[in-house]
Amino acid sequence: KADAVFAFQLR
């Protein structure tokens, strides 16, 4: 999953 990348880009 890309939840970490999502949160990182959703900063």
UniProtKB/Swiss-Prot annotation:
It catalyses: sulfate + ATP + H(+) = adenosine 5'-phosphosulfate + diphosphate. It is an enzyme of class 2 (transferase). Keywords: ATP-binding, Nucleotide-binding, Nucleotidyltransferase, Transferase. One of its GO terms (molecular function) is ATP binding. Its EC number is 2.7.7.4. It comes from the Eukaryota. Belongs to the sulfate adenylyltransferase family. This is Sulfate adenylyltransferase.
